[in-house]
Amino acid sequence: MNEAAARVLVLFGPTAVGKTAVSLEVARRLGAARCAGAARLARAEVISADSRAFFRGLDVVTDKPTHEERERVPHHLIDCVPIDGTYDAMSFRADVERLVPEIVERGRVPLIVGGGTLYLGALLRGLFEGPGSDAALRATLADRSLEEIYKELCDVDPQAAASIHPNDRLRIERALEVYRLSGRPISAWQAEAVPSPFRFVVTGLERERAEHRRAIAERVRWMIENGLVEEFERLRAAGLTPDCQAYRTIGIPEAAAYVSGNITLEELQVRIANRTWQLARRQSAWFRQEKHVRWVDVTGRDAASVARDIIELWSRTSEGER
């Protein structure tokens, strides 16, 4: 198979916008769709680009697709990293470049679904061969305030600082890490990024602000009612510590504070909802910078109707169009 000719359907959007339900409908309906009288389209296989679904055990807190849903539609890159492990954008891209040809060879459509901007960026904007991670340097940066490290980034790489949200600690730390280890700003590395060998048909989901906030509040209530605190306690016993990459997942530090008696159940719910909304806004801002996106408004709609729109976009897209 010629990898350069492989088309990949990408479905992204901020957290709690409804990506999982829509992706399952897209995968199901692709099996029955016909493209302008052409041959029957293959069913999709989902490649997760959810930056926390990679980790085994983060089930409730990430609202992963259920085992039943994963049996109906094949999923990849879910539960592929131990709870105390690490996973980066380079590993993600390598996995995607391995999986896409395999999925296409099976006669199915590769469907990348998620909101992890770091990982999606490695695919859509290209990946650069910069320096690796340095644990000691990361620990030093972690001890400094967010305001301090963002100011440093503004000084050493204003171009990168302009493209990174001031509250996005992970990306700020990575930009400073690259600069300190290589002596070059990350924006210079990014200008040399290697493009993906695939052709992407990119669809983005958006939702009216008030409805989106209600959806986030409902998800947080569901998480707490379905065992968020118990999940945290199990993971802590299994080796999850504040030093772990998975510990940064929204809901985990808050659950730790609740278990320690530092916040009430009501405060737990409010804190998670507020952090989730802040994340959704940052993700939306990042997605809006991406070119060649077909936007689909999901406000007041069910997953089936949204999926029909996405399949129509996919079907209309010519082989040579990104």
Predicted regions: what they are:
Residues 1-322:
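Phosphate/pyrophosphate-binding catalytic cores of soluble transferases and nucleic-acid-acting enzymes
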